[in-house]
Every structure is written in C-alpha cells, then in structure tokens.
C-alpha cells in the first residue's frame, strides 16, 4: 500500500533522517494525534454523551429551550 513515488515528490529533499531504520530490538511506538492530544473533558461531544447516558438529564435539558423561550417572552419589553 505504501509505495514511494520519486516522481511525485520531486521537490522533497531527502535527508539521512528519511532513511532511518530502527536498531535491532528497538521499540517503535506510533501514536495518533488523538492519543497525543486527548479531547478536553469540557468538550460539547463529551457532555452530550453524558446527558444521553442519563435519562433524567436528557428529559430535563429537552425542556430547557422551551422554558428559556417562555421566560424571554415574559421579560421582553413590548414596543
């Protein structure tokens, strides 16, 4: 799958580091971007999953937009 085409990378400079090979018995660990930088716990996706896991939370938060709209309509000055 990983075939190197020299024609595709004509501008790429090949240095000694590109031909690096591990020493016998040396351990190589390739970490993905997510493993190196885990998502913060305050991200919207993680809080959304917590709400979906708890039935009471999902029910109460579903009513919040309607409640907020009702309060806004009460406190808005009419012109």
Swiss-Prot record:
Polar residues: bias regions: 48-61
GO annotation, biological process: symbiont-mediated suppression of host innate immune response
Ranges annotated as biased composition (Low complexity): 38-47
InterPro entries: Gemini_C4
Renumbered residue ranges of the record's region Disordered: 1-24, 36-79
KW Phosphoprotein (keyword) present: no
Entry keywords, A to Z: Host-virus interaction, Inhibition of host innate immune response by virus, Suppressor of RNA silencing, Viral immunoevasion
Similarity field: Belongs to the geminiviridae protein AC4/C4 family.
Its job: Pathogenicity determinant. May act as a suppressor of RNA-mediated gene silencing, also known as post-transcriptional gene silencing (PTGS), a mechanism of plant viral defense that limits the accumulation of viral RNAs.
Protein name: Protein AC4
Organism: Abutilon mosaic virus (isolate West India)
């Amino acid at each position: 799958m990983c075939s190197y085409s020299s024609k595709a990378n004509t501008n790429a400079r090949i240095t000694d580091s590109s031909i690096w090979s591990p020493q016998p018995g040396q351990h190589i660990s390739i970490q993905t971007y997510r493993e190196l930088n885990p998502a913060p716990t305050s991200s919207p996706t993680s809080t959304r999953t917590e709400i979906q896991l708890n039935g009471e939370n999902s029910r109460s938060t579903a009513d919040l937009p309607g409640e907020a709209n009702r309060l806004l309509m009460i406190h808005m000055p009419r012109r």
